[in-house]
Amino acid sequence: MNKELSFEEGIEHLERIVRELEQKEVPLEQALNLFRQGIELVQKCNNQLDYAEKQMQILLENPNGELEVRPADFPVEG
């Protein structure tokens, strides 16, 4: 995977891999290679989601009843 894939491209590629693996005539070596690629894509997409979560902001009401924007405060693994 030389090219940086967007999240959506990664999911599409992962779906293609799953469809190909579901075919019964896939040789073992090819299936293992596809499985490895799929695992790499899942990790990449998870990292992209984690990054997006870090960038999100949550609109909250402060004690004065005013709305304020604060960074989301939830744990992100990575």
Curated annotation (Swiss-Prot):
UniProt-listed InterPro entries: Exonuc_VII_S, Exonuc_VII_ssu_sf
Single Gene Ontology BP annotation: DNA catabolic process
Gene Ontology cellular-component terms listed: cytosol; exodeoxyribonuclease VII complex
Compartments (UniProt record): Cytoplasm
Disulphide connectivity of cysteines: none
Pfam families: Exonuc_VII_S
Keyword Isomerase among record annotations: no
GO molecular function, one term: exodeoxyribonuclease VII activity
EC code(s) of this entry: 3.1.11.6
Reactions the enzyme catalyzes: Exonucleolytic cleavage in either 5'- to 3'- or 3'- to 5'-direction to yield nucleoside 5'-phosphates
Alphabetic keyword roster: Cytoplasm, Exonuclease, Hydrolase, Nuclease
Enzyme class name: hydrolase
Entry annotated with the keyword Coiled coil: no
Protein family according to the UniProt entry: Belongs to the XseB family.
HAMAP family: Exonuc_7_S
Record NCBIfam families: xseB
Subunit structure: Heterooligomer composed of large and small subunits.
PANTHER family (alphabetical): EXODEOXYRIBONUCLEASE 7 SMALL SUBUNIT
Protein role: Bidirectionally degrades single-stranded DNA into large acid-insoluble oligonucleotides, which are then degraded further into small acid-soluble oligonucleotides.
Protein name: Exodeoxyribonuclease 7 small subunit
Biological source species: Desulfitobacterium hafniense (strain Y51)
Gene designation per UniProt: xseB
